[in-house]
């Protein structure tokens, strides 16, 4: 599939309480991450070990009443996909913005059913790393045979 879901975000009224809940229920590792853009208090959520199926995400203070759980879809160009969103009846909630230097960009939209979804565009640095990671995985798989 060309555009997989690659990240989730869980908003919480009480981040410490939510952190304890998800760690105790699922055994997820949750730790605070520095976020230079906007000073947002953000926690990385690791749900799997490297090489295992699944996605990781984030936990943060709810910044608006009713803020829902959000999934982020990986795309090559946020601007292109926001154009597709609006052309097909969706609306842009948050235009493209950089997460932090070297971390890529995100945007948020609502679909025709008022569901909120996010878009994630890797940074140029991350795009350069991707082929190297694929080559490394292929080499490991070849050694196992």
Regions found by a protein language model. Name each.
Residues 45-50, 109-112, 122:
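Active-site beta-strand termini and strand-to-loop segments that position acidic
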Residues 2, 9-53, 100-103:
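Core segments of cupin and vicinal oxygen chelate
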Residues 1-20, 68-71, 121-145:
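N-terminal beta-strand motif that seeds the catalytic metal site of vicinal oxygen chelate
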Residues 5-13, 61-86, 105-110:
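Vicinal oxygen chelate
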Residues 89, 112-113:
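Residue-level recognition of short loop/turn positions
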Residues 18-22, 85, 114:
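Conserved active-site tyrosine of GNAT-family acetyltransferases
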């Amino acid at each position: 599939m060309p555009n997989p879901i690659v990240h989730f975000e869980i908003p919480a009224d009480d981040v410490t309480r939510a952190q304890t809940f998800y760690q105790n229920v699922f055994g997820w590792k949750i730790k605070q991450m520095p976020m230079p853009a906007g000073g947002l208090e953000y926690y990385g959520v690791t749900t799997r070990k490297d090489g295992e199926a699944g996605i990781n995400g984030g936990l943060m203070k709810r910044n608006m009443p009713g803020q829902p759980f959000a999934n982020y879809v990986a795309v090559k160009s946020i601007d292109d996909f926001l154009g597709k969103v609006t052309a097909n009846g969706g609306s842009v909630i948050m235009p493209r913005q950089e997460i932090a230097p070297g971390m890529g960009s995100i945007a948020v939209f609502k679909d025709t059913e008022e569901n909120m979804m996010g878009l994630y565009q890797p940074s140029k640095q991350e795009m350069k790393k991707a082929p190297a990671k694929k080559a490394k995985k292929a080499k490991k798989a070849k050694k196992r045979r």
